[in-house]
Amino acid sequence: MGASGSGKTSMRSMIFSNNPASLTERLGATIDVEQNHVRFLGDLILNLWDCGGQEAFMESYLHQQRSTVFSAVGVLIYVFDIETRELGRDLEYFRECLEGLRQYSPAASVFLLVHKMDLVREGERAAVLARKREELERASGGKGVTVFGTSIYDETLYKAWSGIVHTLIPNASTLSRHLRIFADACSANEVVLFERTTFLVIATSSSSAPAPVDGGDISAAEAAAAAAPDETALNPKRYERTSELIKAFKQSCSRLREEFHSLEMELAEFTAVLDEMTKNTYVLVIVHNPVVETAAIKMNIRIARRKFEELQGDNTPS
Amino acid sequence: MSLPDHPSTKPEVSKDGSVHRTKVLLLGTRRSGKTSIQQVLFNDLPPKQTFYLEPTMRVTQHLYDAKGNSTIIPLELWDCPGNITVDTLGAPLSDFSTVVFVVDIRDNYQQPISKLVEFVAGAYDVNPGINFEVFIHKAEKLQEDDKIENFRQIQERVTERLADESPEYEQVALNFHLTSVYDHSLQEAFSRVLHKLIDSLEFIEGLLNVFCSNTSSPKAFLFDTTSKLYVATDSSPVDQATHTLCCDYLRMLSSFAPLYKSNAASEPRVHALSPTPTPPPTATSSSPASTSSARALLSQSPSDEPSSGVAKKSLFYPSAAASLSPSHPGTTLTYHLVTPHLALLALLPTTVYEMRKGLVEWNVVWLREGIREIWEVEKTRSTTTHFT
Ligand SMILES: Nc1nc2c(ncn2[C@@H]2O[C@H](COP(=O)(O)OP(=O)(O)OP(=O)(O)O)[C@@H](O)[C@H]2O)c(=O)[nH]1
Ligand SMILES: Nc1nc2c(ncn2[C@@H]2O[C@H](COP(=O)(O)OP(=O)(O)O)[C@@H](O)[C@H]2O)c(=O)[nH]1
Ligand SMILES: [Mg+2]
């Protein structure tokens, strides 16, 4: 949900349809609700409702269609255009949406995206976002919400959506635990598991500072990183930047009618392999120890494959 | 081996010394995109940001020199305001080896063509060997058909106007390129411009041809990693899509590398297996580097130590490979750093990459040695000439 032109359809098309940012300029306004079933992790079917934001539609969601729209909602994502001139009305609608949720889907999680952050000067983004976050939290009146600043032109998009889908993965903690075991087996400094089509991060294991993917903790970890710019600290944006980079490269490959399949690197600082883990996931393994070769990592991935297929099998609500 | 009297003995270097070959003049009417081109190519300015560039008021020289060996040829790029004339330029046209003339593809061509003709005329008397490279720019703004049609028309009019002025001008080399900052056509065009300035191009191409035939690679580029321009490629034709993929790959790798680097990590890496860099057996006989002229060139290298020196063994050369499917039998896009600033990007059949990795690595080492030797010669030459 969100006002017309705030960027909902743009984000959806980039994350779930692999479109580049440049194509979003051609999108027309969404009429009424566009329903999309997207397969995530193979068996998890997300039913995305992209609700056209023009006023007439909003009125209808809040009144005539109220029970249809707000029943059985798992996640509400409300998009605020950073440049909006009608924040008052936007907030009004948002509060009414929360009311609808309270009535029909009280357990739903709520994510607020402060979108088009690229239009804010880089130095001011953090401050602008902090102010917005406070304002939106106040407007949410006690309902716990997670706020992300986003833009389709940088990695913030992937960070926000990784945070959102993370809440939908049923056995996230089991997955993380096994990922840690796998990381140890590889002597890996970092292991990142991505969903195959969206390349959103679904689990990570890092030998350095813990960096969980779910929204709430990210800002805390980031604040800590910003407060103490530790010489040894890894780039706090590395996971979402990886999603962004690989997605862009996949698009380059498909323009040549090729499909990206896997990647291995032996760089000055680390050895890395990015390869299929299961039918629906990709894994990135980063090893700083120079003795470990890519072939060994690939072998480990091959061995771990079955275990992870099984884990995912357990995912299926039978 | 002593260093012969150089470079005056080199026939292809003009008698006024090779300092001039490094100067490139960027011309064109106002708002045609000169500064954008310079900024996107050499300062990594995102194309969208070119929108905010201020008009250029004075001639500005940008130096991309051999500092840290960052490019294979030291460049001096002169960015000019739109109203510059031969007289107000502040340097004789004989100083320049190349003029890049930028024309907005949607412009009324009258004015830019007059300006171009004016410069061709000015150059003809003092420097007939100068290269004129016409960038028909902002090409992405037009549909494919219109693009081609405008491109053809501009070429035709330029040729007509030049012939009208004087039949002699036909001797001036004019090349036309379609360019845009929004795709890699700009990088490709500028790479081609550079190629004409690299004396040793033919030897490097020869090395790449050998690499391709030894490894069954359909295409290999040698890229300058900083500017992401390619310095040379093998003799098979360049397909734009492949070139674009290589540029994107290079960009992705260079963004990826700093992400997972930890400052806490141990000392710089050493290559575990450092094969003695001698030419692979398959390469020796067909090697163009063993032709007599190349031998002569290579033997001038001042650091002509045995190539398997101990110091070099400790160097680590990063590499990467991306495998692509579903093309059959599958393609692997490889990346190998061959000097601190040059990277070999090659398309290899996945079967060769996976089953005959040793062969590929041998050929990379061999290529690296060849490049290094050519490179040493180039460097000596450019430093020598700076003092003449
Ligand atoms: N600068 C900037 N523009 C964006 C961003 N995201 C989307 N846009 C642009 O905003 C415009 C509207 O985007 P849509 O995705 O169609 O908006 P919507 O929310 O689906 O609008 P309705 O369907 O009418 O509700 C497009 O021109 C996008 O290119 C962003 O992060 N930054
Ligand atoms: N569409 C498009 N616009 C371009 C391109 N290159 C430059 N521009 C725009 O052209 C305008 C003038 O560019 P600038 O580099 O300042 O021109 P200069 O006066 O020749 O230096 C700017 O608004 C750029 O954004 C291009 O390839 N495509
Ligand atoms: Mg829409």
Cite the ranges covered by each PLM segment.
Chain B
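Short, flexible boundary segments at extreme N-termini or domain junctions of P-loop NTPases and their
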Residues: 1-29, 62-66, 163-166, 179, ...
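A charged amphipathic helix-loop-strand protein-protein interaction module that recurs
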Residues: 204, 237-333
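Short hydrophobic/glycine-rich mini-motifs in sensory/regulatory modules
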Residues: 337-345
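Switch I (effector-binding) loop of TRAFAC-class P-loop GTPase G-domains
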Residues: 42-72, 84
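Inter-motif core of Ras-like GTPase G domains
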Residues: 85-112, 116-127
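Canonical P-loop GTPase G-domain recognition
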Residues: 130-132, 140-219, 238-242, 248, ...
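Conserved nucleotide-sensing/catalytic segment adjacent to the nucleotide-binding pocket
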Residues: 63-97
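Glycine-rich phosphate-binding P-loop
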Residues: 22-45
